[in-house]
Each structure stands twice: as structure tokens, then as C-alpha cells.
Amino acid sequence: MSEPIYDARTLWELLERRVANSPDRAFLIDDADRTVTFGEAKNQAERMAAGFAALGVGEGTPVTWVLPTRIDTVVTSLALSRLGAVQNPIIHIYRDREVGFCIRQTAAELVLTPGEWSGFDYQAMVERVVADLDEPPAVVDASAGLPEGDPAALPPVPTVPADGQDAIRWIYYTSGTTSDPKGVLHTDASLMAGGVGLARALDMQPTDVGSIAFPYAHIGGPDYLVCLLANGFPAVLVEKFDLMAAIESFNRHGVTMAGGSTVFYTMFLGVQRQQPDDPIIPTLRLLSGGGAPKPPEVFFEVQAEMGIPVAHGYGMTESPMICQGSPTDTDDQLAHTEGHPVFAAAVTICRPDGSECDRDEEGEVRISGPQLFSGYRDPTLNDEAFDEAGRFRSGDLAVMRGDGHVTLTGRVKDIIIRKGENIAAKEIEDVLYAHPKVGAVAVIGLPDPGRGERVCAVVETAEGAEPLTYDEMVAVCTDAALMRQKVPEQLVVHDGPLPRNATMKILKYELKDALVDVPWSDV
């Protein structure tokens, strides 16, 4: 087995070096069991790059793509990397308003769509939003085939500048828990630093088999791609997530690492409970993911019933990896923290004045390091985003323990102020999640004339369970020794699943908007 490749400067260099080491090893496996090797993927990417070049794509050309998690999508991203294009991947849940905003702000010259996919016509949507532009981009329907050409006609591979100032190669938009997306600028180097951090923390090996069951257009997609290329192992791609179909596919291909977010853990756990003596995926060595903090109870349930650890991580669009749990961590570390800062990432917990907190003192997470983004597409947002020391203000609250592991405690803006008392929503959510009737929960603050804000718990009922009652909610909070002021005054049992974005993060602002004007009385 070859050594991992952790020092490449560009994504294309990483692919070339992987192909030189192991061209015939499996790389990508799709839902239909089609397998592409590293060498085959490079050859396909070069042909596709030649086709894009014939359309006028070159170094620095902005290209927007909204494509499903497919082999061809991964190859497309590699082909555009070969040319040095500036890629703007868009998650498939975006619609006219968001897609139009991204195309305009990035000044895209080419847009790639899947045509009609999953019951929605993406080609028609893009054609609508570009129709009124002064200089509309070319729009290509990938369902009719992507362009190809002769690799011999390709221009030279773009080089890294001698001054080491890496060029912007990616523009991602924030995942949509706020109303206005922000364009986040990344270089190949910053994305690869995140992927290397993840690979090191999870001790990824050439013998592993990974999985991408989340949208590849999410920043976690290319980050995971880096893991595959750096360590030389394959991944199973899931285009449309169906739980039982995914489990069958993972079993066929011997997947060793799976996950995506807390909701994936609980879905796998639900199937495992139906066959407690028979592992649903015997080859799994761990579940891993991120997107939102996991309740400690999830770790202990998965460990007890599936016999494997949950190694959860912490990242965001601006810094794809910040902290990551490791299979070598203790149970306490895995259950109660988001892991240790990843390789080369600098994480500081700060007071409002910017001074560093003591260990176990709550403060804001501020970040620096090679995995950090280069700023926003709208530069007017940068002054507020970075502090005087150049650290990114994450907006997340956390404590760094004595062992260097980080526990998220909430959001700076997710603090509920009830009668002058600061209440962290996450603390209450972790308590309520432990109740068997709770499938998912969001704790929000709603305007209240007597309290300033009142604490409202919005609960998604666990599959097969009866709805949680108010008295049961109070009892579980009391049993957990929550102070009385933190016990929610209001319980809303949500009709159906809680609203989520493409990475399964609960959209609290939608819940607040839906409930803010609903009459309520505690009398």
C-alpha cells in the first residue's frame, strides 16, 4: 500500500499523483454498481475538460453547476479543476431566487444542470433566471451528455503562483439557515486542508470503503473526494437517498465508513433495532458526519446497539473542517465533544473582547489555519467576519476542555433571553432528545410580553411513538436537573418532519416564522 498524499497543492495534482500510484484501484461506485478506477476517472476528466475548453472555459472562468451525486458529477468537478475554472456548486434544493442570485453574483459564464431530475426541471429553471441577464451564460443540460474533446488540445495545467498565493477556485454559498446566502471563496489548498484533516482524524486507509450519501455539491463533497484521492480508497455514491437501498448497497460493497449527519445515525439505528442480533452493515467500523452537533445520547445508543463508534465532526462552509472526533478517542470524548481541532487548524475560544478563554470557559469559536476560506464574494461582509487577529468569528459558542477537545454549547445568536437569563437552546435539546418519544427537537425563543422571550420546544415525534405530552417534557427536564427557568413554557408537536436544509440541519428560522404570530397562553 502506498503512503497517503497529504502535500499536493491543487486537486488536479492530487489526482495525477494518485493515478501514478494506483491507477487500477476502484475510485467511484454508483447506485447501479458501475465502478470507475482512478485512472479511468482521470482519462474521462481530461476528455471532458477538452470539451469544456472548446466552450470557452479556461483558468478563472466561473462555472455554476447544480448536479446530483453521480460519478459524472465528480468527474465534472475534476475536469473543471484541470482547467483551473472557478466552480460554483449549488445544492439541488435551491430554486429560482437562490440560483439566480448565485449566477449573478459569481458572473457565471457556463451553467450545468441535470435537466429534469427528481421531479423538477432544473434546465427550465436556469433558463428562466438567466433570460433577463444582459450577458446570459451558456446553459448545458447534462442529461443530454456533457461535452468531450481531444485531451491533446488541452492548454497547460495551471500552476501555483511562485508567491504561494493560491487562486480562488471555488465559490460556495452558505447552506441556508438564514435568508440571504453568502458566497464563500475557497482555494484548492483550503478545501484540501479540510479533507486532509478529516482523513488524518479518522485514520483513513487504502483498505477502507467510504460513502457519499449527502449532496456532492455541498462543501463536504470535494472535501471527501480529497480523502479518497489522498488515501486511495473508493466511495459508494448515493444519488437519491433511500435508507434500505443504501444499506443494501453498502453491504454489497463492504462500506467501512458511513454517515453524514445526526439524522443518518438515527436512521441506521432504527433499522438496527429491528434486527438487534444481526449487524445491518457488518463491515462498518464507524459512523461519522457533521452539519449540527449530535446529542451525547446518540453516541451511546449507536455504540450499545450497533457496536461501533460515532466520530462526529464540526465544520462549516467557511472552514470545512474545524474539529473531528477520532476512533482512538475515549467514549467520553466521542459522546460529549465534537472532537479535537483537525491537523493544522487553529481554534481559539474567545471572550467578546477577543481575549482567550480559560479551559472549560464558554466563549465564541474563532478559527484560523490553512482550511479557512479567503473571504466572502461580497467583500463588505469581511470586516465583521474577521477579528483584529485575522481569526474568523464563527458565531458558535463552545468550551475547550482540558484535553483540547471542543464541546459546542450553542450559537451566539441562538441564546434565548428569558427574564434577563441567558438560556442555551442546545442544552435543552440534548435533554429532550433522550426521551424515546422524541425523534428530533428544536428549541427556539419566541417573543413574550412578560418574559422578553419564552422557551418553546418544537418536537418531531419518533417513528412509531405517541406524541410527547407537556407533562412528559417537564418531567424529562426535571429529571435531568435543568434549572426551572430553562424548562420550556411551550411545547409544539410538529406535524411531520422538522424543516431541514440539504445537509439535514434544522431550519429554526422557518419554525420561528411559523409560530411567532400563533396565539399562546400559559394560563
Indicate where each model-derived feature is located.
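AMP-binding/adenylate-forming catalytic domain of the ANL superfamily
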Residues: L482-T503, D522
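Conserved pre-ATP/AMP-binding loop-to-beta segment of ANL
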Residues: A8, P23-A26, D141, P151-Y173, ...
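Conserved ATP/PPi-binding loop(s) of AMP-dependent carboxylate-activating enzymes
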Residues: H340-A344, S355-A385, I423
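Gly/Ser/Thr-rich phosphate-binding loop
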Residues: A230, R252-G260, L269-Q333, A346, ...
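Structural core segment of the AMP-binding/adenylate-forming
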Residues: L55, A85-G149, E463
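Conserved AMP-binding/adenylate-forming core of the ANL superfamily
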Residues: E3-A8, E16, D24-R70, V74-L78, ...
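Conserved AMP-binding/adenylation subdomain of ANL enzymes
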Residues: M192-V209, Y216-M257, V271-Q272
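AMP-binding/adenylate-forming catalytic core of the ANL superfamily
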Residues: Y94, G100-C102, V111-T113, A258, ...
